[in-house]
Amino acid sequence: MAENPIYGPFFGVMGAASAIIFSALGAAYGTAKSGTGIAAMSVMRPELIMKSIIPVVMAGIIAIYGLVVAVLIAGSLDSPSNNYTLYRGFIHLGAGLAVGFSGLAAGFAIGIVGDAGVRGTAQQPRLFVGMILILIFAEVLGLYGLIVAIYLYTKQ
């Protein structure tokens, strides 16, 4: 019972919660920031709205990363009497924090790049490819967190 304390599952629940909360915060910021850029750009160039929606979609994908890890963690939560160790709780917390904080950072990057990129593309269409490349690098930050979280999750 010493390695299965009653508070062990608390850390697992905190891992699941932090995975979805922080990645959703990043996705929300990225969506809001790039969405304001799209709204400002569409006043002058309404024909570019559908082309400029890419940053919003990429920001939404960040939340899916957190959702995947949160569902994985929540699916393996169990009571301490059913051999849910403190080690497992810490692993789940680490996995949730990894994907959550990397999703938060990626969402911030996508929002800032998406806002500036959409506004710049409205004035100079050749900036579109550069914006997409930078957005891909920002999205990969969230993907790194997902990879680390899944790797940690499999260590239980």
Curated annotation (Swiss-Prot):
Keywords carried by this UniProt record: Hydrogen ion transport, Ion transport, Membrane, Transmembrane, Transmembrane helix, Transport
State the signal peptide span: none
Keyword Transport attached: yes
The compartments listed are: Membrane
Report TM segments.
8-30, 53-73, 93-114, 127-152
Q: Which residues lie on this side of the membrane: Lumenal?
A: 1-7, 74-92, 153-156
Looking up Gene3D superfamilies in the UniProt record yields:
lithium bound rotor ring of v- atpase (1.20.120.610)
Pfam hit, one: ATP-synt_C
Q: Could you tell me the membrane topology recorded for this protein? A: Multi-pass membrane protein
* Molecular function GO labels: proton-transporting ATPase activity, rotational mechanism
At what residues does the UniProt record annotate the site feature described as Essential for proton translocation? E139
GO CC terms, sorted: proton-transporting V-type ATPase, V0 domain
Taken from the record's topology, the Cytoplasmic segments are 31-52, 115-126
Primary location class:
membrane
Subunit details for this protein?
A: V-ATPase is a heteromultimeric enzyme made up of two complexes: the ATP-hydrolytic V1 complex and the proton translocation V0 complex. The V1 complex consists of three catalytic AB heterodimers that form a heterohexamer, three peripheral stalks each consisting of EG heterodimers, one central rotor including subunits D and F, and the regulatory subunits C and H. The proton translocation complex V0 consists of the proton transport subunit a, a ring of proteolipid subunits c9c'', rotary subunit d, subunits e and f, and the accessory subunits VhaAC45 and ATP6AP2.
Q: Which NCBIfam families match?
A: V_ATP_synt_C
Q: Which family does it belong to?
A: Belongs to the V-ATPase proteolipid subunit family.
Primary role: Proton-conducting pore forming subunit of the V0 complex of vacuolar(H+)-ATPase (V-ATPase), a multisubunit enzyme composed of a peripheral complex (V1) that hydrolyzes ATP and a membrane integral complex (V0) that translocates protons. V-ATPase is responsible for acidifying and maintaining the pH of intracellular compartments and in some cell types, is targeted to the plasma membrane, where it is responsible for acidifying the extracellular environment.
UniProt protein name: V-type proton ATPase 16 kDa proteolipid subunit c
Q: What organism is the protein native to?
A: Manduca sexta (Tobacco hawkmoth)
Q: What is the lineage of its organism?
A: Eukaryota, Metazoa, Ecdysozoa, Arthropoda, Hexapoda
